[in-house]
């Protein structure tokens, strides 16, 4: 199973908040990665999104936390012309979404995988495109997609 988690999911592994309802799913995904039960693909822009949040929210720990995430050595997909054009087309079709979110979703569509996000607003806008799930509603390990 190919999963494309966005920054909102990845950050849960290092900025843990027990009060968040989707923490169980985030932890399950992390454990599944370590056990080689799922394959992760990410657009290269994930580094910028995650680095930005860590630098702003945890400036004293940002370098250490970012190193932990980089150690996963995720397979990254560069944003070439064809990919970028698909992202822009996706934005046109799904009004009001960001290039960042669309890049993750388009990658999941291209890989026939699942875009996993904690962003309810995005899922509501884009679920008709398929291959997207809200982390809090994700049935860990199943192929259920919205």
Give short role names for the model-derived ranges.
Residues 6, 101, 119:
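Acidic active-site catalytic centers that drive phospho-/nucleotidyl reactions
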Residues 44, 81, 101-102:
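Glycine-rich phosphate-binding loop at the start of an alpha helix
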Residues 2, 42, 47, 76, ...:
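Acidic, PIN/NYN-like endoribonuclease modules and their adjacent C-terminal/linker elements
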Residues 70-94:
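Acidic catalytic patch
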Residues 1-42, 55-64, 129, 140-145:
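Short, well-structured N-terminal submotif of metal-dependent ribonuclease cores
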Residues 9-10, 49-53, 69, 86, ...:
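A general alpha-helix detector
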Residues 36-39, 92-96:
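A short glycine/serine-rich beta->alpha loop
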Residues 59-65, 72-77:
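Helix-adjacent hinge/juxtasegments
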């Amino acid at each position: 199973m190919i999963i494309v988690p966005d920054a909102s999911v990845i950050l849960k592994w290092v900025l843990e908040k027990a009060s968040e309802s989707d923490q169980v799913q985030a932890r399950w995904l992390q454990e599944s990665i370590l056990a080689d039960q799922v394959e992760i693909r990410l657009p290269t822009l994930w580094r910028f999104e995650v680095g930005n949040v860590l630098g702003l929210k945890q400036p004293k720990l940002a370098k250490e936390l970012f190193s932990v995430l980089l150690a996963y050595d995720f397979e990254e997909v560069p944003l070439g012309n064809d990919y970028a054009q698909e992202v822009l087309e996706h934005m046109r079709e799904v009004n009001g979404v960001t290039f960042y979110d669309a890049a993750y979703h388009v990658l999941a569509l291209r890989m026939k995988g699942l875009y996993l996000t904690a962003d309810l607003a995005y899922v509501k806008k884009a679920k008709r495109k398929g291959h997207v799930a809200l982390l809090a509603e994700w049935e860990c390990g199943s192929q259920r997609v919205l």
